[in-house]
Regions:
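Catalytic His-Asp segment of secreted/periplasmic serine-dependent ester chemistry enzymes
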Residues: 129-247
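Well-ordered, non-membrane alpha-helical segments in soluble/globular domains
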Residues: 56-65, 96-109, 143-164
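Extended catalytic cores and adjacent scaffolds of nucleotide/polyanion-binding enzymes
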Residues: 95, 123, 137
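Alpha/beta-hydrolase-fold catalytic nucleophile elbow
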Residues: 83, 125-126, 182
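Conserved SGNH/GDSL esterase-like catalytic core that processes O-acyl groups on lipids
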Residues: 2-100
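Short, well-ordered beta-to-alpha junction loops that form the rim of enzyme active sites
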Residues: 13, 126-129
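Sec-exported extracytoplasmic/periplasmic mature domains
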Residues: 16, 24, 28, 32, ...
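Aromatic-lined carbohydrate-recognition surfaces of secreted/lumenal glycan-active proteins
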Residues: 118-127
Length: 249
């Protein structure tokens, strides 16, 4: 319906909730955001990709509570931002093995998301920020950079018609939402990214572990996500509530 709510859910681990909890007030205060869009932080500390594989995991109850607190039902969750990683990825081998394990876990998590939120139509995929300052094996380079390939493979597999990622009821049982690229958050430390000059300084990551974002790192991601949702051709019409001229015909 034209006045129905659009639940926008985050899916991911500690970094994701830390960034999304800064994105939410930023988005809610932005005049460009449609009042129909309700931002809900489903991401949770310690809940890396493998934890979303179990449909009975405690994390789902937490999402349910947060969703209800935001005044939403499961059927109103229509869009998600999935930013995931593998905890201690070295255990899964070198590239591409660890990225394949990561991809398989996300596929199973997506099936659970679609089952629990039947009107979840789009999931925007992001891999994590630079991890070259990491002091622990939790989520270091080069694994973090390489995890973006799993996101690419997910999108490619869906385009290729893999049944476990089918989003089109005309082609069989729907197992997944539509997968689209979200904002790409990685940049090579202090080397400016060609597209937009993005860098990550040491102070953009926390002092203690160099793995989780500091307040400045969180702000960078929140800004990137908000800008993406306001400008991406697949997102801006529902996020701002303004149909493009093509869509309004």
């Amino acid at each position: 319906s034209k006045d129905g709510k659009i639940g926008l859910l985050s899916v991911g681990m500690s970094n994701t909730t830390q960034e999304y909890s800064l994105f939410k007030p930023l988005a809610d205060a932005d005049a460009a955001k449609s009042p129909r869009v309700i931002v809900v932080d489903g991401a949770q500390g310690g809940q890396a990709a493998i934890h979303w594989v179990d449909p009975k995991a405690p994390l789902w109850k937490t999402i349910d509570e947060r969703m209800k607190a935001a005044g939403l039902s499961a059927r109103q969750i229509q869009v998600a931002w999935l930013k995931q990683a593998t905890a201690n990825p070295a255990k899964d081998g070198d590239f591409p093995q660890h990225a394949k394990v990561f991809q398989e876990n996300i596929v199973k998590g997506l099936a659970n998301l679609k089952e629990k939120f039947p009107n979840l139509r789009i999931v925007y995929l992001s891999s994590r920020i630079y991890a070259g300052y990491a002091k622990t094996p939790l989520s270091p380079e080069p694994y973090v950079y390489e995890e973006a390939f799993a996101m690419r493979w997910l999108i490619q597999d869906q385009i290729a018609g893999k049944p476990e990622l089918n989003y089109d009821a005309a082609k069989g049982e729907v197992k997944s939402p539509l997968l689209l690229w979200g904002p790409y958050l990685w940049a090579d430390g202090e080397t400016p990214r060609k597209a937009d000059g993005l860098i990550y300084k040491r102070e953009d990551l926390r002092d203690d572990d160099g793995t989780h974002p500091s307040d400045t790192g969180r702000q960078k991601v929140a800004n990137l996500l908000l800008n993406f949702l306001k400008t991406d051709p697949t997102a801006k019409s529902w996020f701002t509530g303004k149909l493009s001229k093509a869509g309004a015909r």
